[in-house]
Curated annotation (Swiss-Prot):
It comes from Euglena anabaena (Euglenaria anabaena). It comes from the Eukaryota. It catalyses: RNA(n) + a ribonucleoside 5'-triphosphate = RNA(n+1) + diphosphate. The lineage of its organism: Eukaryota, Discoba, Euglenozoa, Euglenida, Spirocuta. GO terms for biological process: DNA-templated transcription. This is DNA-directed RNA polymerase subunit alpha. GO terms for cellular component: chloroplast; DNA-directed RNA polymerase complex; mitochondrion.
Amino acid sequence: MKLLKISILRQSTFKNKKYNLFKIKTNRDFNPLVIGTKIRRNLIKETKGTKITQASLFVLNKKSKEKLYHSLNEFTNIEEISEKTNEIIKNLERLKIKLVNKNLKKKIICITLTKENSFFKEIYKTIKISNLNQKICTIKSHNVEIKLLLKIEKEKGIKFNPIETINFIIPKKNNENNSSLFLETIRNDQTFTELYQSLKLIYNQQI
């Protein structure tokens, strides 16, 4: 009979990070170095994450008679906005996010920003953001309005992966059937589910 037991020894959050310590126990002998390497490889390869993969910025001058939005390229510098366009895009890419609808793999959203309007108040119904302290931009004038067109995707791969640290801990007593795994991830991820699926796959391969 196969037995694979995963226990949560400790789980905590600090700022925009989640820290998890798991205990892994099995009735099958295995080399802890081999399974540790396989767990890391599998989690990095298979764990899904969510990122803003494309951002288009448009600006409107409310004083202008045209009342048209003009596209901003990465070299555009507007006096009424503290940050350059490329800085705003980099700030957007730094957001640690998760789609509210778990079944969605891709979503395009449009956000309008003004001096009075907060980015996070506009976006909270669509995605969850763990690093709410991440600055996006500062609009200094009431006459300027920015429209953001954001493409958000949920996928596998290093670019999307929410896991930042993986440590496999081998007991000093060399009890190979009883080891621990430490994971540091962004706050909104589904670490336990991904870990269980990863271990189940490795275990069934009869390491």
